Amino acid sequence: MANDQMAAQMSGKGGFIAALDQSGGSTPGALRLYGIAESAYSGEAEMFRLMHEMRVRMITSPAFNGDKVIAAILFERTMDGLAQGKPVPTFLWEERGVVPFLKVDKGLEAEADGVSLMKPMPDLDPLLARAAKLGVYGTKMRSVINLASKTGVAAIARQQFEIGEQIARHGLMPILEPEVSIKSPDKAGAEALLLAELTKGLDALPADRQVMFKLTLPETPDFYAPLIKDKRVARVVALSGGYTRADACKRLAANHGMIASFSRALAQDLRQSMSDAEFNVALASAIDEIYRASVVKV
C-alpha cells in the first residue's frame, strides 16, 4: 500500500523535505527572489499562476526526485494543480518517489504574549478530506514564538497538538511547526520552554499516534535529540528560518538525526530567466548541499 511505503520513507529514509508552500502573503517575495517583479503581473490569479509555473519547473526538474528529496510540502493551489498532466500529489509520488504534504494553516494571528498563534481554520475538515483523496500523506501548519513566554509557548504547543489530533482523524500525518524566531532576544530560553511543552504534548497522545515536528535550528546542537529518539515522533525536520543556505546547512549538520525542510534556502539561486539547463544545475546544486547537511553530520 502506498501509505505504508510513504510512512517508511518519512520515518527512515535519508534525504530532506522540500518546502514548496508559499501562501498568498509570502508569494510576492518568492517571485521577486525568482526574478519576477510585482509590476510583471496584476491580480492574485496571475500571481498564483506564475508561482505554480515555478513550482512545476522545480518538481519536474531531473534532480527533484526521491533519491534526495523524500517529501514536498505543497500550498493548496499547488496540490490542486497539474504537473505533466497529472495531479501534483500523484505526479510527485508516482513519477518522482516524493511524498506529498499539504500546508493547511491560514496564517498567523497578531502577536500576543510573545507568540503568534494560527488563525482559525473553519474549513479544515473538508480540506483534509480532499487532500486525503488526492493522495496527500500529511500536513504542515506553522505558528511563531518570538519571546520566551511560558504561557505563550504553552498556548502554541496546545494549539498545534489539538489541531494535529483533528488532522490525524483523517488518517494524515501532521507536521507540527512551532517556529522559534531566529530574531528572538532569548532564543535558547524559548527553545527550552518549547521542548518541555512538546514533551508534555507527546505524553498526552493516544498510544498508537505519531507526529512530526518542524523546528527552528536550535542554539545548542542536538538540543532536540530527546524528540528525535521518541517513538511517538516519526521525524524531526528543520526550517531555515531566514538563515542563508550556507548557515542553515552548517547548523543542520551539527544536529544529528534532524533533516532539512527548507523553502527559501532551496530556491534562493533559481531565476526565471535561466535556461532549463542552468536552472537544473542550480537546483541540483542546492539539493546536493541540503541533502549533505541532512545526512552527513559533524
Give the label of every model feature segment.
Residues V144-L147, G152-Q166, L172:
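Internal active-site segments that recognize and position negatively charged phosphoryl groups
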Residues I163, I167-L217:
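Aromatic-anchored, glycine/proline-accented short structural segments
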Residues M1-Y137, I145-L147, E197, G201-L215, ...:
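Alpha/beta catalytic barrel-like cores
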Residues A110-V115, T139-A154, S181-K187:
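Surface-exposed cleft-lining segments at the edges of enzyme active sites
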Residues G135-S143, L172-E179:
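Glycine-rich, often proline-containing surface loops adjacent to acidic residues and nearby aromatics
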Residues A154-A155, K187-A190, I290, S294:
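Short amphipathic alpha-helical patches
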Residues V153-I163, A190-K200, I228-R235:
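Short, electropositive alpha-helical surface patch
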